[in-house]
Amino acid sequence: DSISHAVMILGINRIRSWATLVSLGKLNHKPDELQTESLMRAYMCENLSTKFSAEVQQMSFSAGLLSCLDAWFDYPLEQLMKVLPLSHELRDAVVLKTGETGQLLSVVVKYMHSQWDQIPANQLSELGLTLADLSDAYAYAIARTDQISELMIEE
């Protein structure tokens, strides 16, 4: 019952990403906080991406999720991303923080780490975002991550 509920909430592609994340955590004996950080980044990127092109929207969740891969494997992110079958745009967004998806990810990471002073106002305006957008996206990410955590506890 909770699995079908999860599929309704997340969609099948998100379930695959989430299952991979959970598996990584169990295999590598990583703290729950890493899973939370990964999901928070993914959902915050997803929420903010609605102001962007369809291409950015499609990559944003994955970019947020993949941006913590180095912590999961204790290996440099750039090396890990080279071996994954990903588009150059997604790879560059995660590793180099280039393109709109990369810039979005950069802002999300800084916001989540309370590095607000390192988010240039002109970068936000170029992306068409405001601090209120970031705050709303953060609240959204918390709510979605909490939903996932509750589903995991039910299992």
Stretch-by-stretch model annotation:
Residues 1-155:
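Conserved alpha-helical "signature site"
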